Amino acid sequence: MRSLDYAKVITKLVSFIQEKVEESNVKGVILGISGGVDSATVAYLAARAIGKEKVLGLVMPYHINRDVEDALLVCNNLGINYKVINIKSIVNEFEKNLDFELNNVSRGNIMSRTRMILLYAHANSKNYLVLGTSNRSEFLTGYFTKWGDSASDYAPLINLYKTEVWNIARILGVPNEIINKKPSAGLWEGQTDEKDLGITYKLLDEILYRLVDLKMKKENIARELNIPLNKVEYVESLIKKSEHKRKLPIGPEI
Amino acid sequence: MRSLDYAKVITKLVSFIQEKVEESNVKGVILGISGGVDSATVAYLAARAIGKEKVLGLVMPYHINRDVEDALLVCNNLGINYKVINIKSIVNEFEKNLDFELNNVSRGNIMSRTRMILLYAHANSKNYLVLGTSNRSEFLTGYFTKWGDSASDYAPLINLYKTEVWNIARILGVPNEIINKKPSAGLWEGQTDEKDLGITYKLLDEILYRLVDLKMKKENIARELNIPLNKVEYVESLIKKSEHKRKLPIGPEI
């Protein structure tokens, strides 16, 4: 992986948040706090950037599990304002209005988009910016819900790989139990990112960095990382299949 | 305004829809049908492009008014499949989970994003593409809900001005009562686009075309259209203020 001066990166992230808050002439920022490392990292950065009083965390569980405790741990450690809104009744209301069964992925998409709506309703009413918590590993592989968790005003971590976010989280003082737990989007019980993705973030980032940033040939990546070529081809296929998710809708040129 | 060969433009729009359906390996397209001219035009184009059996219209009222009849008129005229889902109970469920009052704009945003969620839930389950109905006049002035009505897979009309969509609608045979009625996003009773925008689409498009496409000087535009300079400056301000709405969320370069 690239070697980063993490102190400098953190300074850059903090000043980015400060600049956007000032430019947008808003009173603060709001973000969804899931209990995972990405949202915890953005919360720590935001509190450092503009002060805990101007940061509002929304804890929006569907399932009641340990993630909620971890989310509250982040909010209480930082001393930021927060609200807990269980989204089950809203997601159920969507389901009542559909005449077909939802599978886990579709229900997960509704959860993610429901959270986006709640974040923006609060942002509208408080004149806040919505901070996204997406990282580069998710963005490049399409491991997010289109117009859901990827929909925000600014996404401070969007150019940082997951393994780099872990390092930043440690430096910022995010609690270890959050850093060390298996990453999960929490869209269904027992879900983990790495099971979904079919690869560990550690290996995924090593491949993504060489494939996308360094533009290395697949064969050289496989040789350098001492892994089968099909692992690199698999990651390449994730990038290609999710291309449409990284673009605003287009129409024909007139 | 630019002079367009509308027969050619319609052919381009139809083949664009055909191409994207084929490329994406989907079984059809779905779109929200509001009773307005934009969604009616996209419905007519889609039915022409891939056949009425592969087009699903979702009529998603919040208010029960004439727009619903107009939406059903479009669906029945075309013979496409459609469903009517009243979104009030879903929007109410969002409101129940908020501890503050919504104003019209915020409630309108929730309506628009709720419709996006319903469209994508159906698209997921049927392996359909979501067609957006945004036009260039809305896109350039930011007259849409971010991650709401602007959120789709493809937006056939995105490069056509509203006044041009009217012309296309006439050629396609969209009913006159839909073409001739005052455009409205229907987000609250009595709302009209032109009241919100503070300018008629006719004048707005003439200014937008010169300002954005021809990159004319404001003073020359005012002189050419024989309008006060502040009208041009007003349109310019709409474009500037809405710039963030035409971009995916960014983060700092690392």
Swiss-Prot record, chains A, B:
Claim: Transcription regulation is one of the keywords in the record: no
Binding residues for Mg(2+): 38, 138
Catalyzed reaction equations: deamido-NAD(+) + NH4(+) + ATP = AMP + diphosphate + NAD(+) + H(+)
Amino-acid positions noted as binding deamido-NAD(+) in the UniProt annotation, renumbered to this chain: 113, 146, 153, 244-245
Catalytic class of the enzyme: ligase
Ligand binding (ATP): 32-39, 133, 162, 184
GO molecular function ontology, one term from the record: glutaminase activity
Function noted in UniProt: Catalyzes the ATP-dependent amidation of deamido-NAD to form NAD. Uses ammonia as a nitrogen source.
Record organism: Thermococcus sibiricus (strain DSM 12597 / MM 739)
Phylogenetic lineage: Archaea, Methanobacteriati, Methanobacteriota, Thermococci, Thermococcales
Quaternary structure note: Homodimer.
Biological process annotations from GO: NAD biosynthetic process
EC number, UniProt record: 6.3.1.5
Record pathway: Cofactor biosynthesis; NAD(+) biosynthesis; NAD(+) from deamido-NAD(+) (ammonia route): step 1/1
Alphabetical UniProt keywords: ATP-binding, Ligase, Magnesium, Metal-binding, NAD, Nucleotide-binding
Matching PANTHER family: GLUTAMINE-DEPENDENT NAD(+) SYNTHETASE, NH 3 /GLUTAMINE-DEPENDENT NAD + SYNTHETASE
Protein family: Belongs to the NAD synthetase family.
Protein name, as recorded: NH(3)-dependent NAD(+) synthetase
